[in-house]
Amino acid sequence: MNVTADGLRFPDGFLWGASTAAHQIEGNNVNSDWWHMEHSGGSIAEPSGDAADSYHRWREDMDLLAQLGFTDYRFSIEWARIEPAPGHFSRAEIAHYRRMVDGAIERGLRPMVTLHHFTVPRWFAERGGWTADGAAELFERYVRATAPIIATGVRHVCTINEPNMIAVFGAIRELGAEAPPTAGLVLPDKATTDALIQAHRRATAAVKAISADIQVGWSIANQVYQAQPGAEAATAAYSHPREDVFIEAARDDDWIGVQSYTRTRITTDGPIPAPDDAERTLTGWEYYPQALGYALRHTAAIVGDVPLIVTENGIATGDDSRRINYTTGALQEVSAALEDGLHVHGYLHWSALDNYEWGSYKPTFGLISVAPDTFERTPKPSATWLGGLARTGVLPRATS
């Protein structure tokens, strides 16, 4: 990292990209647990439906990202498509995702492949999910089956996206109708936590058996728990089961994904809502681009020299100028972390596309808008701006 007359120059080889998740953009993920929940008359307000139709339009998505100047694309492959029934692996779906890997490489995009991003096959959920006997072994079996997809041309593999949030979801299911807290997160389900860590370790070994050259990690939802005066011990106790235990599990990994959006303030009585005068995004979260700097430093303090990759960071807003402002602030935090010697290897924005945000299409995180009726893609000014940074590797100096 160095400062030039033009601005802050990021290291050569820095990953500049955007991220997506299969269920949120592909459409018609009919064999997944989430599709079943969306159509079971529960609390999910809006089903995913066709999503952004990226299952058929992935080439267009990659064309745009490459044309905009990005060098990296993180996408997930869908377990429910690859193994729609126990032990039945679809050669057609495996070939589909291999075409995506090849398509990224042909366009000059380095593919980062996520093996699990929240959704599981319906049959896996119905047998008890992550806490059922043999769950980690079943995940390992699926990972082994992905060999034709990831064996060549894939440098980075993420085993599980935000396992801490999956454990929180497990606890919420246990609570049933009990209201969630107004700030912070419920205590994760420990059995789910333990199962996910075991699944990650088995998956890591399986990927390494496919190719020792693949760099393997997982990505954590960093909530940025900020201790208010006198609440340092309470904050550490609150953070550990919700975040730190998952970061600790990455100490022997090749890299760890840092995913950050906002902060949560902690008092001796627990988490408190954002300040009344805080700007809020379309998700209701506090606008707080500084969160990424805290997340990087907190993660580095736990994992030491394990490389950090920002695998998600962004903002849900209808005002694209705020997206540019937010991302500028976040990248300033990345540059400061690099200056301080942290091993930050990349920044992948969430999200490449406006997409399905787990019950609603209203929170627009995308650099590229998607027309709901025609699926027409339109890059926003933020996409052109961030792609330009990817081309130059320089974040311009702030102007007064």
Identify the residue ranges that each predicted region occupies.
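Non-catalytic scaffold segments within catalytic domains of secreted glycoside hydrolases
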Residues: 1-62, 66-71, 80-400
